[in-house]
Amino acid sequence: MDAWERNGVDYDVFGSSFYQFWQGNSSKNALAGLQKIENLAKSRGKMYAVMETSWLNSLKDADGTSNVIGEGHANAKVYSDDPQGQVDALTDMYQTLLSNDNGLGAFYWEGAWSPVKAGWTNWKYNKDMSDR
């Protein structure tokens, strides 16, 4: 950011990804990191937004391929691996994000954590599910 300022790069909002799962095995560690990034943006006079975030809803292998995150992974116990865990993770993130006067909000991402059937032939299944 120092180089951007030296070279006159202007931007409206400072944004970053925030995946609590990859921030350590404690929600406090993850949220402290989020607060530091937000404070960095504030020190530069910028608003801050989380550009992508999510939390898993299951550790089960739903598509027959190996998961990056699975049973026994220590960080998976920060929040529960179910829809309530998603609610809890997002609630904590938003409370931290909006506790500072420069937090704007977040974009939810990572559809791979929503189990679907794998493969190129699943278009009909996906279409049928989206029509419900």
What are these regions, as identified by a protein language model?
Residues 1-28, 44-58, 67-69:
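Aromatic- and acid-rich polysaccharide-binding/catalytic face
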Residues 32, 36-39, 58-92, 96, ...:
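Aromatic-rich peripheral "rim/lid" segments of glycoside hydrolase catalytic domains that contact
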